[in-house]
Amino acid sequence: LPIVITDMRNPEKTTTIERKPNNDNGHPIKIITGKKNCAILRIEDEFVHKLLESLENKKRYSEFVILSPFTKDGIKFSRILFLDGDYIKRNEKYVLGFDPLATITYNRGVITLIGDEMWRVQQIVSKTSAKIGESGLNILNIDAQEETSRIIVVVEDTGNNIEKAISAIHEERSNIKFI
């Protein structure tokens, strides 16, 4: 999306700034991070907006990622990944108070891949998830978003699972390329 700057005194003079991605600008995966001690909240979709608004405005807490929703027995649920499991434990009663069907799963670890235009990378999710699986880990959730060029992989946070997953992705990194 180009940015056009116009001279207010002489509108005929303009400057256009436009990003032109270079296909040869290095590897598409720029950063691989790991975070231990996370939690996932499952909450009915109708209550999630009030909870998130309350967390952000009243509690001033925003260290969470909204994961893909699911439907079970005709009820639509949202899933929220909290990056600080201890915070959720301390505020569990408050968080669960928004929905009687809400549940929290602790001991989750998150691996995040951040890059440039990863949507152009063929099989990036399948290659990284296969390599994580080959290292003996069970992937509990994967969330990939074209708009953010971010991939989130959730695994159980036990032992050295996070380190193993990061190492596995680094091993596969050389096989991941732009199309």
Predicted ranges, named:
Residues 1-179:
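C-terminal catalytic "cap/lid" subdomain
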